[in-house]
Amino acid sequence: MTIKESWLLPEGIDELLPQEASQLECLHRSLVDRMRSWGYQLVVPPLVEYLDSLLTGTAKTLDIQTFKLTDQMSGRMLGIRADMTPQVARIAAHKLRNQAEILRLCYIGSVLHTLPQGQGTSRNPIQLGAEIYGHAGPESDVESIEMMADLLHVTGAVSEIALDIGHVGIYRGLAEYAGLTSEQEEALFSALQRKAAAEIDALLDNFKLDDDAHQMLQALAELNGDRSVLEQASTKLAQAPESVKEALATLSTISEMLSQRLPELVINLDLAELRGYHYHTGVVFAAYKPGSAQAIAAGGRYDDIGEHFGHAQPATGFSLDLKMIATLLPVIEDEKAEVIGVEWDSDPALLETVSSLRDAGKVVIYQMPGAAITTSHTLVKQAGHWQVTETGTQTRG
């Protein structure tokens, strides 16, 4: 590698300079404090784990996104986490299983992806999230959405939030009712995610399903909009199995609760919203800035994962990329905060004064010998005492 190339970072890997890092740290502190005010306890999972543990109960996409390496101590395969959610589920199921009937945990940390998850996205995002364990009802889903919206407002990155909400049980139940093979289910899933109407029609024609199954699966791509979508769904999916009707009832309950608790929230019901289809088990949701196609936070219910760690329990939650949120904020110019400079000196009285100033939250830096004074204020000895004065106005004594 040449000198010219030695400073290059891998594609999709970024770093934060002081101003960006300061802004991100402020976000970090304010959001963790906010989650604690909701009763969520912070946990810090490790950056790497044994691969089989890291991928337990997760979708194939997470396996693809995970960097893998060999542990030089045990010879076993390790994975660098690409998502902290399974790690927190492991902690909840194994280490904290007897702590509370309903457990609320939050987390923040760097993750690493083998490939970017979207155009222009970072491969080393900082993931922040929160999970509720031990409650299967719509109330915990609503709490997750409500807190997600609260955190987004706290960041100042958005003034208005558009929420897409769906339920993976609808498509799953219809696919089972239609008797789709796993290959057919995957192909139709892909087309539904892209809202590719012509492809959906061609696939359904090729599957040769009975009329009811064909029409209900065809209707999914069109069933999105405000709460009136649920009324349309009750008609168009009238022949659906009970599991689908239960999923629709859950969506109705959740959307009603959200309308009461967050009347300013713009809610879009999308019955073909299948984000995390192979991982989630119920409601799925994503938050957007109105007019943007890029989700700024997302989550859903995943009731099965705890079983893989020996303690089955319902769970729901959400996560976001703190780096991406920071890009939505205006650049904050460095405040011209008072910085106090002092010449290098080992006077005990000076050292005590510097310590007291720092305890009071002041910024004090030592001027290295030969370096120019660049601070707004200077600590000088006047009448036998160390005093803070504006640079250029001091007199020694």
Predicted regions and their residues:
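TRNA-binding/sensing appendages of the translation machinery
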Residues: 1-86, 142, 164
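Extended alpha-helical scaffolds
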Residues: 155-158, 162-175, 182-184, 198
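Acidic, His- and aromatic-enriched active-site or binding-groove loops in soluble protein domains
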Residues: 65-73, 179-202, 209
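Beta-rich nucleic-acid/ligand-interaction surfaces
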Residues: 47-63, 166-176, 273-281, 372-376
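Positively charged, Gly/Ser-enriched RNA/tRNA-binding surfaces
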Residues: 20, 26-37, 50, 85-96, ...
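A structural signal for short, well-ordered beta-strand segments and their strand-loop junctions
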Residues: 42-45, 107, 162-166, 268-270
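Cap/lid and interdomain-hinge subdomains that line or gate substrate/regulatory clefts
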Residues: 136, 140-141, 164, 174, ...
